Amino acid sequence: MKILFCHDHIFKEYEGEYYSPGKISIEQMESYQSLGDNITIVARSNKVTSLDSSKHNQITHNRVSFCAFPNASNFKSLILRKELLKKAIKIASQYDIIIARLPSEIGSIFAQAGRKLNKPVLIEVVACVWDNLYYFGTIKAKLYAPLAYVRMRNLVKQADFVHYVTSSFLQKRYPTKKGALTLSASDVILSTVSNSQRNLKKNNEISIGVVGSMDN
């Protein structure tokens, strides 16, 4: 079985291999190998001439490959969406299972492609597209939020298999159809924390951090 994983994540291509700046790891990709032997990631990519391997996860190896797809997260892509869908259908036709991580434009395009090809489509609901766009800060994002929200609701409603990363919030905003198989489980992978780290005394400094990608 050949699996296609679809998302807007921007990978870096360095010396023929693909790397993630942190959001996606090889461990996540290997978790899908119970569904099939080979996994192909379809997403955006940038070619770079240097890379700090300590800050990036290599995601390509003998069972995980990469397929670059055009940027679908700009105004131009809305006009060319039919062309992007045709391209997605051509790619998706070579695979047995489509995994679409939403919200993402590439994920939604390939979810549509999978339905047109009558392929099994598993949708991962990892965030609310309305919140992502409406509170992003730009007028264009606010105007696009209702369309993206309705589209994502429809895709989830039509899906036979849905994985939510929340216990109830996303389930209420993006309900499934009757009879759909659903899973509620976080997609976070935690590293082992030693007792010495747990027992560190708190200092008076306050650190504020942001979890997420700043380059999407």
Where are these regions (language model features)?
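Active-site proximal beta-strand in glycosyltransferases
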Residues: 2-7, 115-132, 162-163, 180-186
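Short, well-ordered alpha-helical microsegments
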Residues: 49, 106-110, 170-171
